[in-house]
């Protein structure tokens, strides 16, 4: 069928087209089926229907299809039905609880990267693996396929070090300290990080305050070899692109299949050529890992997968029931990290966690003896070498190396949340703290967030400030404060949690 082209300048993340229902019926295709579009080149796209947006005799091409055809643009194209990709049958096999071969996983990942699958099909695969976990072999094959799906860094100098946090703890700004500590001791650590999806600030959101974070793989390699380390946004690279596409579908489903989590973490480490990796596994209430037993199982699985991939993986189970440090939100966290680098002043939880994990990497990289890594990490902070290295990293990424914590701006609108009575902080709710910080504008508003005056186990008196909320916009501050007062993110010993009034039948 010959159809006239109508471009639609909307990005949908897939090869998609729109047909009028009359033409779709004539072609014999249903919504979600595929069609082949042919002019001087040929591609396959997923079909959407309309009764009035596109007239009969025309085909609407979304941005991605238009771009793919733009070099050989014609006013009309030939459209005919196409078979479903083989991956749809592979997904059905997974749904039936059958095991996949390496070749089938390679085909599936290729189709995901090349946008040949609809989101509902990817969702079916993720749900199937959530219910029926993959075997060790399948998880290894999935990880290798994800590594091979994009760019890879190949360094001439080794070892290559890396660190990853499972997440779930607000204020986890430790990469801003770990990377310069490790690089200052002569090791290479090309740290690719994420932006916050559900949190109040990912490492990339924080580093972006100090320097650009969007670089391609070649630039990351060059900068790392020159100064020893970088702190960049992984989403700007073509490193393990299949992972980003899977995460995009996982998010609205609120699921994180175990095998996918393992593959996601290790694919990014494999793609940057990591030899030694330290995994931070926060455990406790409000984290992804509820208890030590779950943490140990995850650690064993990560170590096992690393061994299969030729990576040396060490895991640290860390305390995750309260925030790291006393700040949540990009600018506030950067200030706290810079203070530690500049003067070794800061919360014990931030210094201890950063030095412990950096120390593990220093020992794995053989620049510190057994059980001596922590001491070397602390010394690197105290003697200013970590700060000097961090300035080099900021400079090579295009930032101002002379920046200090005093130069970082925070939200101008603030309000304290006070203690309702005398006592001790018994508990802090990580998820509520993040919700409140996001209501205040974090992470998009860099100056928004929370400063904690008290943490778990610390005493206070009625009327003392427990936390200060910062916002760049007054309306966002009001929303955050209202939420914090209605449902406080902390419990003070002796405070009333809720009043339930009596009622009378009428």
From Swiss-Prot:
Biological function: Catalyzes the conversion of AMP and phosphate to adenine and ribose 1,5-bisphosphate (R15P). Exhibits phosphorylase activity toward CMP and UMP in addition to AMP. Functions in an archaeal AMP degradation pathway, together with R15P isomerase and RubisCO.
GO molecular function: 1,4-alpha-oligoglucan phosphorylase activity; AMP binding; pentosyltransferase activity
Active site: 256 (proton donor)
Entry-linked Pfam families: Glycos_trans_3N (PF02885), Glycos_transf_3 (PF00591), PYNP_C (PF07831)
GO-annotated biological processes: AMP catabolic process; pyrimidine deoxyribonucleoside metabolic process; pyrimidine nucleobase metabolic process
Amino acids binding AMP: 168, 194-199, 203, 264, 288
Record PROSITE patterns: THYMID_PHOSPHORYLASE (PS00647)
Name the record gives this protein: AMP phosphorylase
Family statement drawn from the similarity comment of this UniProt entry: Belongs to the thymidine/pyrimidine-nucleoside phosphorylase family. Type 2 subfamily.
Source species of the chain: Methanococcoides burtonii (strain DSM 6242 / NBRC 107633 / OCM 468 / ACE-M)
GO cellular component, one term: cytosol
């Amino acid at each position: 069928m010959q159809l006239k082209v109508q471009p639609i300048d909307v990005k949908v993340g897939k090869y998609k087209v729109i047909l009028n229902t009359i033409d779709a019926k004539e072609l014999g295709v249903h919504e979600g089926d595929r069609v082949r579009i042919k002019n001087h080149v040929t591609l396959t796209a997923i079909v959407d229907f309309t009764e009035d947006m596109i007239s009969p005799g025309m085909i609407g091409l979304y941005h991605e299809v238009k771009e793919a055809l733009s070099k050989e643009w014609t006013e009309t194209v030939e459209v005919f039905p196409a078979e479903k990709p083989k991956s749809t049958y592979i997904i059905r096999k997974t749904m039936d609880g059958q095991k996949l071969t390496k070749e089938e996983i390679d085909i599936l990942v290729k189709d995901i990267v090349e946008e040949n699958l609809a989101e509902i099909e990817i969702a079916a695969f993720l749900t199937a693996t959530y219910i029926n976990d993959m075997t060790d072999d399948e998880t290894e094959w999935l990880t290798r396929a994800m590594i091979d799906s994009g760019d890879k860094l190949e360094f001439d100098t080794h070892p290559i070090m890396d660190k990853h946090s499972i997440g779930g703890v607000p204020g986890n700004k430790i990469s801003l300290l770990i990377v310069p500590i490790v690089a200052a001791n002569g090791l290479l650590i090309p740290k690719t990080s994420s932006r916050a999806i559900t949190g109040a600030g990912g490492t990339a959101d924080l580093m972006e305050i100090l320097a650009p974070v969007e670089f391609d793989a070649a630039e990351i390699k060059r900068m790392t070899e020159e100064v020893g380390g970088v702190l960049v946004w992984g989403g700007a690279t073509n490193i393990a692109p299949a992972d980003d596409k899977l995460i995009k579908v996982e998010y609205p489903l609120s699921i994180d299949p175990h095998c996918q989590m393992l593959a996601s973490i290790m694919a990014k480490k494999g793609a940057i050529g990591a030899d030694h990796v330290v995994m931070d596994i926060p455990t406790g209430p409000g984290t992804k890992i509820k208890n030590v037993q779950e943490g140990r199982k995850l650690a064993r699985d990560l170590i096992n997968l690393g061994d299969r991939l030729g990576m040396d993986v060490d895991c640290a189970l860390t305390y995750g029931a309260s925030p790291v440090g006393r700040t949540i939100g990009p600018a506030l966290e950067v200030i706290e990290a810079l203070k530690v680098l500049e003067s070794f002043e800061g919360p014990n939880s931030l210094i201890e966690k950063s030095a412990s994990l950096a120390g593990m990497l220093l020992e794995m990289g053989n620049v510190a003896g057994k059980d001596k890594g922590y001491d070397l990490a602390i010394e690197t902070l105290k003697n200013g070498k970590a700060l000097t290295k961090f300035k080099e990293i900021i400079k090579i990424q295009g930032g101002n190396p002379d920046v200090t914590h005093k130069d970082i701006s925070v939200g101008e609108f603030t309000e304290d949340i006070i203690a309702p009575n005398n006592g001790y902080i018994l508990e802090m709710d990580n998820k509520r703290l993040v919700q409140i910080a996001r209501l205040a504008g974090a992470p998009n508003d860099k100056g928004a967030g929370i400063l904690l005056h008290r943490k778990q186990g610390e005493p206070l008196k009625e009327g003392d400030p427990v936390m200060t909320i910062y916002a760049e916009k007054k309306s966002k501050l009001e929303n955050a404060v209202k939420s914090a007062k209605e449902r406080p993110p902390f419990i003070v010993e002796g405070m009333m949690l809720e009043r339930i009034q009596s009622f009378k039948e009428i």
